[in-house]
Amino acid sequence: NNGDDTLADLGKELNFSVPTVTKMVGELIEDGIVMDFGKMETPGGRRPNIYGLNQSSGYFIGVDISQKRVHIGLINFKGDLIDEQMDISFEEAHPHERFERLCEIIEDFMSHTVVPKDKILSIGINISGRVNPQTGHSYSFFYFDERPLTEMFEEKLGIDVSIDNDSRAMAYGEYIKGRVQAEKNIIYVNVGWGLGLGIIVNGQLYYGKSGFSGEFGHITAFENEILCHCGKKGCLETEASGSALYRKFLEKLHNGQSSLLTQQKENEDEITLNDIIDVALQEDILAIELIEEVGNTLGKHVAGLINLFNPELVIIGGTLANAGDYLILPLRSAIKKYSLNLVNKDSSIKVSKLGDKAGLLGASLLARSKFIGLI
């Protein structure tokens, strides 16, 4: 996790023999990626050498795409975030236009960031929905060409590019730089406009056969006849997500219920998901009630995940996590009510430490790990 270490400790962490680790580290030193920081101070006996990452040997960009916004950041080789740009407008409708717009955003960021382009080794891009990181295809967004999306990005940007699912990247960001301490079995619940999971088993990201794992929002959970964007009806996402909260909030306004937002916005079309969360934090009764409803519904199904996976840690992240206790308290209560007592005792429930930066950090850290062959 980006610290300095001895060869013996690295071998234990990676489950490799010391000779294997010695060979690997030697190659990384030759490439300028790892540095030998000299002897470790010990009370007696033979003093081992300490090795660590050369933070200026290269840089990685992470791109996190949300519903209508893009976050982008730059890390050094040690994983420190050294530049970022949040909430860049991203509203083009056609997949090809969105692709071109995203390339413009990345190129603009590279032209103004604090390091020269030739020091940027790789770019990681988060995309929601079905993403196959191995082949470089995205099947939910930017799907306008049979070629791998990564290949098209590389042609346009002139730099190595990898893609991954947004929830999985967020989980990885928390694992390396966020809420995770010693835990190895983790579920990250991304409650944004949609609903997804990032799953870590025995310290490794779980992808499934084609990288499509974590489609939590598309479990059939209701007989509500609400059409999900996936084309099916009754998905969990239709009642427990940011889009569900947004839909319910507007329905209540149409039915005559009042909110602080009816005073703040002349047109209902101007209301955003973040606006609803903001007024909840200002004690808007309607917003609070609906967020609590989402938390309770979500908690019932997270209870099922706990029964199924027996994780050490469940992290709640994504846009709705910004609602704090209004989401988390009913969610915790439902988990306790609907999960098996003996199983849920093993699981801590925590809110994301990285917040809105989990995606861009996860994307850049994944780009780094893929570049050096850890994933």
What are these regions (language model features)?
Residues 76, 133, 200:
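Short, acidic, Ser/Thr-enriched surface-loop or helix-capping motifs
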Residues 166, 192, 363:
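Active-site glycine-centered loops adjacent to acidic/histidine catalytic or metal-binding residues
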